[in-house]
Amino acid sequence: MKNRIKGHLTEIIVLVVAALLVAADQITKGLITDNFYLGQSVTVIPNALNFTYIHNPGAVFGILKNHPWVFNTVTIIAVIGALIVLASGRVGKKPYIWAIGLVISGGVGNMIDRLSLKYVVDFIEITFIYFPYVFNVADCCVVIGCGIVILQVVIEMIQEFKSKKAKKAKKAADITHLTEENVDE
């Protein structure tokens, strides 16, 4: 039993962190709904960050707002699938494990809102650049998780390219070395 737990320690830690992130998401949303009225905006950092309380009846950035069942179904399937993949232990690289944990936490955090409230509570508004969307902690988790996957894929592509280049250079050097040996004979 100890070896089995030890073999999945990263996954266990990731799930604990994911649960804490879901809690943080729900606590921050609760603080906003308890202390703000709908539509209220408060400057947190001038020209950088506002807290603006809105209801988002759709998915990310308000898409699918007239078809919540579609997004609820997709989210449930995605979260269950991610949990199965994580539990399988087949995700070898830690960045992917952490990315899955972040996506799970974001999906669960927003799913709790959709199922209990029929909308998602959003409140984080970036004002230092033009970004017309208001979002929440769960959205941040999903975006960061997806960003980690993209970054890891790019890193792996670069490593694979360098590895292939090194193999070609070695093969060329071996051919040159063999040719020189044949000339010497």
Task: Describe the role of every protein-language-model region.
Residues 1-185:
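Alpha-helical transmembrane bundles and membrane-interface segments of multipass inner-membrane proteins
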